[in-house]
Each structure stands twice: as C-alpha cells, then as structure tokens.
C-alpha cells in the first residue's frame, strides 16, 4: 500500500490549468469552476483504502458546503493499465454506486498530478476565488474511523476561509497511498 504524506506545496501557489474527462463523460477545465468561491481539488482513486475510508465524508462535505460556493473536484491520476480498478470505466461505476456528487476527473497523462505536486491519495488542495492555494492538508484527524474524528481540519478550514479569517491551526499533511505513476 505504501503510505505517503502530501508534499505541502507553499501557500499562495496558483492553481494549474487542466482539461480532463469526468466520470460523467463531460470535459472539465479549471475555468469550469470559475463561478465557485472555493475550489477543493482532491487527488483520489478508486482502490486506495484511505480514499475508500473518507469518500462518504467528502460526499457529505460537498452537500454541507455547496450552497456556500464550495466545489469539490476529485482527480484520479493513477496508472489504470497497472491498476485497472482505477480506470475511467470503474470511476463511472464508483460514481454511480457511491453517489459521488462532485466532478470526478481522470488524469490519464498524469500531467495534472505532476503540475500540482500531488503524491498521495487523498491529497487535498483548497483554492480561493483568485485560485491561489490557501489550504493543503488532511481531511480530519482519523482517516480510518469516522466516528472517532475530533477535528475536521478541511471543513474547519473552509469555515474560516468563508468567514474571511485566517486558518488558526497547523495544516497537517494528508496521507494515503502513493499515486501509481506510469513506468517510463
């Protein structure tokens, strides 16, 4: 499984443009979300136990925050040839079965993950209206047991940002499986 921690890209780093196909058969770009106040990009996949454990939390977070102008976007950058569970076809199945309520995009070339310096699943990046990085870190303090969560880092960060306040707590790296890079 190979546990990895996110690289903690510097705050203020601009979002990188992309154009990726979604599990809903639409093509999305960074500009597709221009009307959203906050953009939460989550590098994720279908097979990683860390992602499986938090997926419902992400679905719930989208429901909780969409009326406030928050848009979650999942991006799967794994090599689907070596990891067929992470194919676009299986993304479509997972989207239907789990009721994923945010765009789930396939980064076939892996260029988007490399441009964002993403290394693990899940790897979370929050961008403000000007699309500068304002939060990167974990979703909460217990990836494995939702009922034992005592700090919802991502949700709390979104609340502070929406209120126009600085995030007062340390941003702790996300952790999960490594992105499954293509062999050159």
Regions flagged by a language model, labelled:
Residues 1-171, 178-184:
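Chalcogenol-based redox active-site neighborhoods
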